[in-house]
């Protein structure tokens, strides 16, 4: 069967990433391909990327909505707290899909997780505990254990903003020590991660090394992040989980 996914691309990574691993939309496609292979699904995945951070008019048209099965919102170095016109437009679009077109599933990754939360009425703030970086243990809630079939998962992180609550109608599936609201789930409609299931260990380590010693990461933060990456994220498992959600 054809399964149509609109990828709302919210940024271009640093050149050190794009030259080796592609952009965020490419990483999402790789994630979906990986999940499809492990899940052994026979869907014919059809993706179209919309560069929403570049062009405020580059969105799926309403007449296309009946044929769209899902949207995926990528990560971004931009903040979901920003009043930038393109971010306001993105929040408005996601809110429209969330409340008016429930047949369209939504997956949000990091910035995308925050955009979905904000579209559902939850404020986003800068985490007073600072950055959360690299492979991080997510402790699953009771609902999270039911959804994933395990008690903990490791997810790559690269963020300093966070949601402050669970959106109405959503379930909280997991938390970390520094960020309580890590994974949101609305049955048969939305699945969002504060982390980056689409980031490989190599992608995270490259980002950390490029940003070390800058105003973003200190040398100590870099060393700690690289050490945590020795306990790799459960990317294959997460890819399968996302595909299973899309096929619910």
UniProtKB/Swiss-Prot annotation:
Q: What is a single molecular function from GO for this protein?
A: hydrolase activity, acting on carbon-nitrogen (but not peptide) bonds, in linear amides
The name of this protein is Putative glutamine amidotransferase-like protein C13C5.04
Origin organism is Schizosaccharomyces pombe (strain 972 / ATCC 24843)
What are the GO cellular component annotations?
Answer: cytosol; nucleus
Name the Pfam families for this protein.
GATase
Keywords of this protein's UniProt record, alphabetized? Glutamine amidotransferase, Transferase
Write down the superkingdom of origin: Eukaryota
- Domain Glutamine amidotransferase type-1, by residue range, is 13-217
InterPro entries the record matches: ChyE-like, Class_I_gatase-like, GATASE
